[in-house]
Structures are given as C-alpha cells and as structure tokens.
Amino acid sequence: MASPHPRKKRIVQKLPSLTQSCNGELRPCPECLQPHFSKIPILSQLITEHKFMCVSEISAHKVVFKLPKSWFQCEHLKPQEDAVLGSGSFGSVKPISKVTCAKYFTDPVDFYHELIACNLAALAQIRNSTRAIYLVRMTGAYIPCKCILFPRYAGSLYDFKCWDKISAKKLAKEFKSLVNAVNFLNDEVGIIHSDISTSNILVAHGPDFPGTFLLADLGVASLHSGNHQTELCVKNSRGKILYNMSCTRDIFLLCKDPVKPAQVIFRCYLLACKLINSETLHQTFIVGKILAQNIDMASLFYTMLECVEKMLDTKDIKPSREFYNKIGPDDESHKAYFLQFLVPRVVLLEMLSRLWDTKLSIGIDSFGNTTEKNVLEVQDKILFASWCTHLKGFLHKGGLQLNLNKLRAQPLYELVRFFLKFDYFSLSGRQ
C-alpha cells in the first residue's frame, strides 16, 4: 500500500492564543505555549519579533529602538464610547471586544514609556513563555491613537468583592505564581516593576471562579543595573527622537505608600529626622538588580497582606482604610508620615504570629520597639504605638480576629516566611 502524500499528513501548527487558554482562562496556557516555542522555526520567530520594536543603534550606554510600520495604522476595533474599564492619570482603559481591551494615553511621554517596558517584556515572553504566563502581555500597539492592546480580564484585586471565595491555599498558590512574574521581570526582562498593588493584579476568567492572578501595568517600570545599557531611546523612521527613557529613579518615590518596603520607609524617616544626608540619599540613581528584586518582592508581600485583611474582614469595615482616613497623618511633611504605613503590616504579622505560634517580624513591633537601636525618637515611638492600638481597635470592632482560623494553611505560612527574607526596617534591609 502506497504511503499517504506528505502534504495530506502535514499538521498546520498555529500560534497559541494569548487571550484564551485551553482551560478557559484568559491567559497563555503553558501546555500550549511550551511545545510551540520549543519547535517554532527561527524564521517564524523572527517574523513574530518583527511586530515589536527592534534595535537600530547601540552604544556603550544607550540603545535606540525603531518602531514597526504596523503600529502607525490603527486597525483595531473602535472601543465602546461610554464603556470604561478603568482610568487614571495616564488616561483610560476601554473594551475593544469580549477578550481585548485598549489602554489609551493622554500624554505621549507616558505612552512611550509603557510601550518600551511592554515591548521588552513581550520579547522576553517569546523567549521564555513558561515563566511569563503570570504577567499580562501586550498584544498590539497603535501610535496615532496612543493605545496599547491587552487581553481583557475579570477585574483587579482592588475591585474584587468575593473574598469569601478565596481560601488561604488559593491565595498562597496565586501569590506564589506572582513571585514567578516578579522574578521573570527581574531576571529575563531586566526591569523593576515598582508599582505592584491590588489595582495592578488582575483576576482571569476561568471555569473555577476566581481565576488566576496576573501582574499588570508596567507604566512606571524601569531598567535596573543588571543591564549593560542604562539608557533607551525611541526614534521614528526619519530619525526623529520620540522619547528618551531615563533609567534613574528616586528610591523614595518607588511603590505606592501602603505597600512601600520597610527599608525604604526607614530611609524616609531618617531623612525626615535629618539623621542622614538628603543630598546623598535623595539623588536619583539606577536601582541595582538585587534591590529591584527586594523592592518588588516586598511590595508583593504587603499587597498579599492587604488581601489577607480583606479575607478576614467579613463585615467589610475596611480597618486599614479607616485607620488611614481617621488616624494617620495626610501631610507628607509630617516627620512620621511614612511610619503609618508600617502599622497594618506590623499588626497583621503579630496576629499571624499568634495563629502559627511563631515570630514574624519586619524589625519593628506594635509598641514601636525596633531591632535597630534608638531609631525612633521617643515621641514618634509613642505615636506609633498609639496608631497600632487604634488599628487593633478597628480590627476588634470588625471581629477579624475571630476569622483567623481560615488562614491555617501550610502553603500560606511558608509563603509568608519566604517573603520576609526580602524586607526589614533597617537601612540595608534584612541582612
């Protein structure tokens, strides 16, 4: 019997969808992606990469990108006029279809900054797709209307309401996956996210609600010192400079205040007390690779603790928000302003310490005692202790301590211990 014609035996290998995985979640499926990218011909990979920015010039310290022609033609569907999925200082996010949304920017500087960061991440995702599945990937960009396309998800943890459906094991599983996303950005992309928070962690659709958690929004991401080049530039086809990305950062402006690392808050406090040289420490600089990882891991940890509070807060009294609104100072010139953001994490860690019969500490307790000797001035130590007492009162009022047993899960305990390695209330973090 003659063998079948080879063309009839050929299997056409399609690019796995980046918006619909085989289990129904709006994310790349590792089972689908890994075989694809391990077998894809190099020519096909180059064609895929051609849809993104490519390097046109390289110097000792600078890389110049040129933009693909496809980005100058708006071929995407028009968004629904009145539908807005989210908004901020950058602009707004609008739905394009059931599986795609567009992030529109009002300022071209913000647009090109995020576009560069997303471009670097997208190219790294092609090279190592498995490690990147918990990071939201751009699927297109259009210069004329200043928008970047992304897969559409169910919403963010900031707006999430169904905390009764989240178990301690589920929370630990999802945040352990987000650790992979942070490591991917640090190791493979060479950037610090620097804006991890509940508003930038999205929840995917899936057969089991809630779905997978994914890290999003590279709007303020920047290079760390693990890169050979520390400056980036975007030019159009005529050589006109569209954007220069400064890779220097002010460490005091990294992360949202409620999840700012304790070691950063330590420096902010010393600076306010004039115990360190502001001219030295307040200068902008390129964040080191290890410091970048510590900062992102710490902010991810404190974001998880915010989720722990939400899981315990069955009466929805929002104790930490109540504390910030009624007790904590809102004037950044207040010497102890940044200390208030230590209060929720210190109190929650003491609650978890009692639950698990262990000591969980970031170098300061609810009485204002610090591992570093003579850090807080006497009046600030008394003030900090009173703040912790106020928050404990809010927690008791909401009965959060009565729900602690739902956190009895070994994976969550192990993850908390893991996160504690990355931050401490001292000048150099945990040694």
UniProtKB/Swiss-Prot annotation:
Residues annotated as the enzyme's active site: 195 (proton acceptor)
SMART domains documented for this protein: S_TKc
Keywords: ATP-binding, Kinase, Nucleotide-binding, Transferase, Tyrosine-protein kinase
Protein kinase domain segment(s): 79-368
InterPro entries named among the record's database cross-references: Kinase-like_dom_sf, Prot_kinase_dom, Tyr_kinase_AS
Cystine residue pairs: none
EC code(s) of this entry: 2.7.1.-
Entry-linked Gene3D superfamilies: Transferase(Phosphotransferase) domain 1
GO molecular function list: ATP binding; protein tyrosine kinase activity
Binding site for ATP: 85-93, 103
Assigned protein family: Belongs to the protein kinase superfamily. Tyr protein kinase family. HCMV ganciclovir subfamily.
Role according to the record: Phosphorylates the antiviral nucleoside analog ganciclovir.
Name of the molecule in the record: Probable ganciclovir kinase
Gene: 36
